[in-house]
Amino acid sequence: MDEERLLEDLKHVFPQRPEVAVGPGDDTAVIRLPGSDRLLLLTVDQVVGGVHVLPGEAPERIAEKLVRRNVSDIAAMGGRPAYAMLTVAGKPLSEEFLGAFHRGVQRACAEYGICVVGGDVSSLPEEGAVFTLSLLGFAEEGCVKLRRSARPGDLLCGTGCYGRSFESGHHLTFRPRLQEGVFLGKSPAVHAMMDVSDGLLKDARRMAMESGLALRFECEHIPLRAGASVEDALCDGEDYELICAVDPAGADALCSAFPNLSRMGCFVNGTPGSVSGIPALNKKGFDHFHENV
């Protein structure tokens, strides 16, 4: 079992209602609101002790990461966050830890205009900690970008730098590309978009697969974080940048208006999800059901 297969299974297990524009499989679900020109975006994400943060990490840092990685999903759809539900489960959970964690969540939410409207707290039978945030946001009709909408000839573009997120501390200090997501969502030149959490290669391949296309990387154009190799950039994950498929006819104007956007490859006709232009790799992108090295 891997994440991709599990997701495909879930698509068949859970039927969708007519108002669901996008169900399982993208950065957020998308719901049509009767009588409104806005779309409702829903996402949920976790921070698990020992998986997403090291044991003993400060509660404020955990809180910031939890909020920001959810905001990154909203950004990837071209929307803005609005309301959140918070769940905490752990053993042990001290009053001091919970107080610092909740204050950290509030500060992070306030930064992005999010109102926490409820949640739950529970113990665990064994030592550990799981923090979950469900986030609701909104996007304008026509500004939502799906990962499955890349077209042949589109350029693979991305914000920011890649690689060595854990070693550099970026996975705790990153800022979700919210304003960039709104900007890119409004551009007709952007056909598809998603955030990068499991590794640039794995997530870009997902976009190609969902779009029924192959992907050709131009690795010499991938912006590298300090000390990172091309392999690190392709495989490390936890970058929380945005990648998008851009119409080549509009790419120059888009990159001029948004200098932080780099061209890293292109989508082409071919076996869906196949990738060329990359070196031999020893690493793999992140998968919760496999050993990650």
Feature names for model-found ranges:
Residues 245-251:
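Helix N-cap motif at beta-to-alpha junctions
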Residues 59-83, 100-111, 179, 183, ...:
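Small-aliphatic-rich amphipathic alpha-helix that forms the alpha element of a beta-alpha
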Residues 92-93, 172-238, 268:
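Active-site-proximal betaalpha loop/short-helix elements
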Residues 40, 47, 80-166, 266:
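Glycine-rich anion-binding loops of enzyme active sites
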Residues 1-58, 77, 86, 103-108, ...:
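Extreme N-terminal cap/leader segments of soluble proteins
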Residues 30, 70, 78, 116, ...:
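Residue-level signal for inorganic ion chemistry
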Residues 255-293:
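Acidic, Ser/Thr/Pro-rich beta/coil linker or hinge segments at domain junctions
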